[in-house]
């Protein structure tokens, strides 16, 4: 017997004996089979993917046409509809040159708004190379907010941007507000407002961000070697443990730690270079750096190879 569980409102069929096994789908028979024990845990399975057919009169010609889009469970009717493609023969047009067969697709205004938002979310995610699971979670968040009508008066693009920010936090791959701003047309201030309103409306939360959440990506974008990244991570963690940076954002602390580590190595980076990657101003980096500089000897890992001694580091 198949057991089902809900993940983000989407059903998942699992084997009762091997719940972690990835089921094998037999499309010909319409069965879902457990590869571990061979149990058929689902039958008469319907393929909800998009369907392609070939309508060419010439069998040697390949012109597959989509005759059905994939099902979208986030829309009210699953977005199951029939689309008529453009004709190519003379019989497809009337005497005025207009297509005889045209789409008469009915879609509610709410579904149309969600479809537009989903497209915008996918576009934003593609621009910063976010995986599909982030897009799916963002779409689910947007649907919940939209149906609750709790953010009436806010632009859908702003809500979508805030949902993307929340989804990244919840999936453990946080992005900064400025990174989301860069791929959307929404200001940081508006995304921040929607972010707080969404958390309140959905009664959900996100994990607190730490300096470690950004360190690897920032250092990679700055083309810094592994030794500098490890040193910057150590510096930031020790600075927090020693309570040297109270009230400072993890992003500014991470940027200051990277600046200190790079200045002590042969791979030096300027405040502007780091600020451009981290999305913080030079003055913000300097303020955090000044807080940790007096304890610099205590912040570096013991095995760090200095190119510039601690006492020669910039004092700013």
Curated annotation (Swiss-Prot):
Q: What tissue expression does the UniProt record report for this protein?
A: Expressed in the inner cell mass forming the embryoblast. Not detected in cells from the outer thin layer trophoblast (at protein level).
The listed outcome for residue 189 to L is:
Reduces interaction with VP16
Annotated GO biological processes are: DNA-templated transcription initiation; meiotic sister chromatid cohesion; positive regulation of core promoter binding; protein acetylation; RNA polymerase II core complex assembly; RNA polymerase II preinitiation complex assembly; spindle assembly; transcription by RNA polymerase II
Q: What is the effect of changing residue 286 to A?
A: Reduces DNA-binding
Per its UniProt entry, which superkingdom is the organism in? Eukaryota
**Amino acids binding Zn(2+):** 15, 18, 34, 37
sequence repeat segments run 124-200, 218-294
Q: Name one GO molecular function term.
A: RNA polymerase II general transcription initiation factor activity
Query: What family does this belong to?
Result: Belongs to the TFIIB family.
Cited function: General transcription factor that plays a role in transcription initiation by RNA polymerase II (Pol II). Involved in the pre-initiation complex (PIC) formation and Pol II recruitment at promoter DNA. Together with the TATA box-bound TBP forms the core initiation complex and provides a bridge between TBP and the Pol II-TFIIF complex. Released from the PIC early following the onset of transcription during the initiation and elongation transition and reassociates with TBP during the next transcription cycle. Associates with chromatin to core promoter-specific regions.
Q: What is this protein called?
A: Transcription initiation factor IIB
What is the species of this protein?
A: Homo sapiens (Human)
Encoding gene (name): GTF2B
